[in-house]
Amino acid sequence: MALKEIVEQTVAGLGYDLVEIERSAGGLLRITIDLPWVPGTAGSEAEQFVTVEDCEKVTRQLLFALEVDGVDYKRLEVSSPGIDRPLRHGQDFERFVGREIDVTLKAPIGAAAGALVNATRKKFRGTLERTQSSNGESGVVPGWQIVWSDAPEVKPGQRVSKKRLPAPLQALGFTLDELKEARLAPIVSFKGRGAKAGTEPNLD
């Protein structure tokens, strides 16, 4: 049985979601897990996080499963996603609609950039939104975009004129196939990992 299949079955069997599998130098096998998400429950209750006990439970079961299948590794590490959780699947994007995320495109934005964005740019930060697009015979299919504003950061003690116009909102639509990487923006908040996005500056 392939490594990914072993890990997915073990993690799911214990009631968790598999986020990431990484093999590092020195034989380290790193597994990242998260608590499962039920569609339609976002914001209905306080967000819960993976605990040390959760990681220990998954570690014990994985040690047994990997030994049975003869997987070659030196050390196993099971951890929670952290504040910069990777987004890899459609369900991940559904889960974090309304959150601030960082995306890296496989190719520069090019002609779609318009006048306000550098055409060679590939990295963006903005609030994740769900859109819909037409796909021929398939009809309407889910799509995604991030929205941001390039408003200058207000320094402590700085007065902002009431006459200053707000910076225009910008949007970037994308499909998952166009992404090289996507992660939750690592913004520390006392409201938890899923705190609603603000107007943080986007990445160059």
UniProtKB/Swiss-Prot annotation:
What is the stated purpose of this protein?
A: Required for maturation of 30S ribosomal subunits.
**Keyword Cytoplasm among UniProt keywords:** yes
Where would you say this protein principally sits, based on its record? cytoplasm
Q: Which organism is it from?
A: Albidiferax ferrireducens (strain ATCC BAA-621 / DSM 15236 / T118)
Q: Does the keyword Cytoplasm apply?
A: yes
Give me the Gene Ontology terms describing cellular component.
cytosol
Specify the taxonomic lineage: Bacteria, Pseudomonadati, Pseudomonadota, Betaproteobacteria, Burkholderiales
Quote the HAMAP family the UniProt record gives. Answer: RimP
Membrane-spanning segments: none
- Share an example GO biological-process annotation for this protein: translation
Subcellular location per UniProt equals:
Cytoplasm
Q: Which family does it belong to?
A: Belongs to the RimP family.
* Pfam families xrefs: RimP_N (PF02576)
Q: Which NCBIfam families match?
A: PRK00092.2-1, PRK14642.1
Under InterPro entries, the record lists: Ribosome_maturation_RimP, RimP_C, RimP_C_sf, RimP_N, RimP_N_sf
Q: What's the protein name?
A: Ribosome maturation factor RimP
The protein's gene is named: rimP
What keywords are assigned to this protein? Cytoplasm, Ribosome biogenesis
